[in-house]
Amino acid sequence: AAQQEGKFYVMALGAGSSLYSVYDELVRRYNEKALSFRNVVVFNAYEYYPLQKDSSLRTINQLKDRFLNHVDVAEQNIFTLDGFVAQDAVQDSCRLYEQRIKTFGGLDVALLGVGRSGNIAANEPGSGIQSMTRIILIGNTSREEMENSEQTKETIPPCSLTMGIATLLSAKSIYLTAWGEEKAEIMQKVVENSITDTLPASFLQTHPNAHVVIDLGAAHHLTRIEHPWLVTSCQWSDKLVRSALVWLCQKLGKPILKLTNKDYN
């Protein structure tokens, strides 16, 4: 639609592995001539800092290798945070990034993954809802996750440059992805717990057009999946009855033979 109107469509892209299947699908649709990215402007959501000259860790290169080099987005429409900028110029570089986003009319969409600590982009626990693009120290949990996912022996830098929570929330729509049971616990907290800066992804609950895209594994601890009788009417299978009985016994601290009619109601 943006292309037909001659407008830019501005995307903030995360580089996490949970987004790879999304990018693969976008490339597939491009190859089938179902999509074009000629009017797309891309802003990288975060970058490691400081980076060595020939670093293999650059997230923008990961985005290009997986997605951008395989579609028709113009090179001049791809922007990234500068992992090589001098330390005394970091703040100015981050401010310029915010200004450049505004120059293109703001973000239309943000595609994000979520880390085990509830971080989005590189916004670690403690990031405020009004935070803008800035430098941030990488937390221990995120560092372990990065070391496991990055296929390199190169040392992860101490910091990241990242779009802030407010920057991401300014997008017209947001998509958060997570796959597998290892993300089930954090997704339950992100979706169902209270909004808190100790869980940055929970701020997405405040957005009117935020979407969570997860598989059954990552959804495992959501109430609708794990305890559906609490939120909807159920078709009671033997397995579901057993699950509900175990849950009720644990909740009341009673063995099953001690349950009464009152407990069931």
Predicted regions and their residues:
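ATP/nucleoside-binding phosphotransfer catalytic cores, i.e., glycine-rich phosphate-binding loops
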Residues: K172-N265
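Glycine-rich beta-strand-to-loop/alpha-helix junction loops that act as flexible
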Residues: L13-S18, L112-R116, W179
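Solvent-exposed alpha-helices and their adjacent loops that cap or buttress functional pockets
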Residues: Q4-E5, A34-S36, V71-D72, I101-G105, ...
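N-terminal glycine-/serine-/threonine-rich phosphate-binding loop
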Residues: A1-M11, R28, T260-N261, N265
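A short secondary-structure junction signal
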Residues: V90-D92, I120-G126, S131-T133, I186-V190, ...
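A glycine- and small-aliphatic-rich helix-loop capping segment at beta-alpha/alpha-beta transitions
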Residues: D24-S36, T59-N61, D65, P125-I135, ...
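Class I SAM-dependent methyltransferase SAM-binding "motif I" and its flanking Rossmann-like core
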Residues: A121-I165
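Ligand-binding beta-strand-loop-alpha-helix segment within the catalytic cores
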Residues: K33-V109, T232-I256, D263-Y264
